[in-house]
Curated annotation (Swiss-Prot):
Localization, UniProt: Cytoplasm
InterPro entries linked to this entry: EF-Ts_dimer_sf, Transl_elong_EFTs/EF1B, Transl_elong_EFTs/EF1B_dimer, Transl_elong_Ts_CS, UBA-like_sf
Pfam families for this protein: EF_TS (PF00889)
Region listing for Involved in Mg(2+) ion dislocation from EF-Tu, in residue ranges: 79-82
Gene3D superfamilies: 1.10.286.20, DNA helicase RuvA subunit, C-terminal domain (1.10.8.10), Elongation factor Ts, dimerisation domain (3.30.479.20)
SUPFAM superfamilies on file: Elongation factor Ts (EF-Ts), dimerisation domain, UBA-like
Tree of life domain: Bacteria
GO cellular component: cytoplasm
Keywords: Cytoplasm, Elongation factor, Protein biosynthesis
UniProt function note: Associates with the EF-Tu.GDP complex and induces the exchange of GDP to GTP. It remains bound to the aminoacyl-tRNA.EF-Tu.GTP complex up to the GTP hydrolysis stage on the ribosome.
Protein name in UniProt: Elongation factor Ts
Annotated family: Belongs to the EF-Ts family.
Length: 305
C-alpha cells in the first residue's frame, strides 16, 4: 500500500523514530499507527515513554473541594491569552464549584447549574463576552466516607486554576491536616509521573497484554532459549508495573521509598491507618491536537478580505 507523508510524520511525532524506520513500520502494519508504534518498540527503535498524543488546546483546568470531596474540570478556549482573562477564570471557578454538586462525570457536570443555566449553556454564552469559542470538556471527582481529598494545581495562573490538576483521595480516621499534607505530596507525584493505575489489578488488561507481547518480541531477538525468555519477560513486566502503578512507583518526594511505603511512613504523622483509594489527573488539552495555522497565509487572507 502507499504510505502518505502525513502518516509518516504522525508516526515520527509519536515515536521520535527516523523517517525510513517509520515508513518500514507503516508498510509492515498496513498503515495502522498503533500497530506501527508497537512494531517500532519491538525493534527497539521507539521508546515506551514517548507520549502517544500531543497537547495543543488552550484554556484552564480548575479544582474545587468541599469537605471530603473534590473535583477537577477542564474548560477549553482558543488561545492562551483568554486563559488569563478574569471573566474566563471566573467561569472556570463557577463550573468547578457547580461540579461539586454532581457525581463528577462529564455528562453530569455539563448539565450542572451555573447562574441559572447549564454549564454547557454558560460556556456558550461566554463566547459573546470573551470573544472566543469556549467549551467545557471533561471532569472527574473523588470522595471518601472519612478522610480527605487533596488537590494540586501545576502551572497555576490563579488560585485553583492552572494547566494541570490532580486529586488524591486518602481514607483515614486520623488527623485531617496531616493527611492533606501527605495527599498534596502524592498529588504532586501524580502530576509529575502520570501513573496509569492505583494498583497492578487496576491496570487495563489489554494494555498489560500489549506490553507483554512487545517484551516477548524483544526477548526473542536475543536468541535465548524459551525458559530464559520467560524469565526475561517476567522481569520486564515486573518493571513495567513498578513504573506505571502509583503505589509501586518510587516516590518523587523521596525516591528511596515507593508511594506505598511513604504512605506507611506518613501514618505516623496522621496517627491512624491510611489508604489511598483513588486519584484523578487532568492535563489541559491532553489528547487534543489543535490545527496549526499558517500565519503568513492568515495575514494574506486578512489583507484580501
Amino acid at each position: 500500500m502507499s504510505i502518505s507523508a502525513s502518516l509518516v510524520k504522525e508516526l515520527r511525532d509519536l515515536t521520535g523514530a527516523g523517517m525510513m524506520d517509520c515508513k518500514a513500520a507503516l508498510a509492515a502494519t498496513e498503515g495502522k499507527i498503533e500497530a506501527a508504534v508497537d512494531w517500532l518498540r519491538a525493534k527497539g527503535i521507539a521508546k515506551a515513554d514517548k507520549k502517544a498524543g500531543r497537547t495543543a488546546a488552550e484554556g484552564l483546568v480548575g479544582v474545587a473541594a468541599s469537605g471530603n470531596k473534590a473535583v477537577v474540570v477542564e474548560v477549553n478556549s482558543e488561545t492562551d491569552f483568554v486563559a488569563r482573562n478574569d471573566a474566563f477564570q471566573e467561569l472556570v471557578r463557577k463550573i468547578a464549584q457547580a461540579a461539586l454538586s454532581t457525581d463528577g462525570s462529564s455528562e453530569a457536570v455539563a448539565n450542572a447549574n451555573v447562574d441559572g443555566k447549564t454549564v454547557t449553556e454558560a460556556a456558550k454564552d461566554a463566547v459573546a463576552t470573551i470573544g472566543e469559542n469556549i467549551s467545557f470538556r471533561r471532569s472527574a471527582a473523588l470522595s471518601v466516607p472519612q478522610g480527605v481529598v487533596a488537590t494540586y494545581i501545576h502551572n497555576g495562573v490563579a488560585d485553583g486554576l492552572g494547566k494541570l490538576g490532580v486529586l488524591v483521595a486518602i481514607e483515614t480516621a486520623g488527623d485531617a491536616e496531616a493527611a492533606q499534607a501527605f495527599g498534596r505530596q502524592v498529588a504532586m507525584h501524580v502530576a509529575a509521573v502520570n501513573p496509569l493505575a492505583l494498583t497492578s489489578a487496576d491496570v487495563n488488561p489489554e494494555a498489560a497484554e500489549r506490553e507483554k507481547a512487545i517484551f516477548i518480541d524483544q526477548a526473542r531477538q536475543s536468541g535465548k532459549p524459551d525458559n530464559i525468555i520467560e524469565k526475561m519477560v517476567e522481569g520486564r513486566m515486573r518493571k513495567f508495573y513498578e513504573e506505571v502503578v502509583l503505589l509501586s512507583q518510587a516516590f518523587v518526594i523521596n525516591p528511596d521509598l515507593t508511594v506505598e511505603a511513604a504512605l506507611k511512613d506518613a501514618e505516623k504523622a496522621i496517627g491512624a491507618p491510611a489508604k489511598i483509594t483513588g486519584f484523578a489527573r487532568i492535563a489541559l488539552g491532553e489528547g487534543i491536537e489543535k490545527e496549526e495555522s499558517d500565519f503568513a497565509a492568515e495575514v494574506a487572507a486578512a489583507a484580501k478580505g
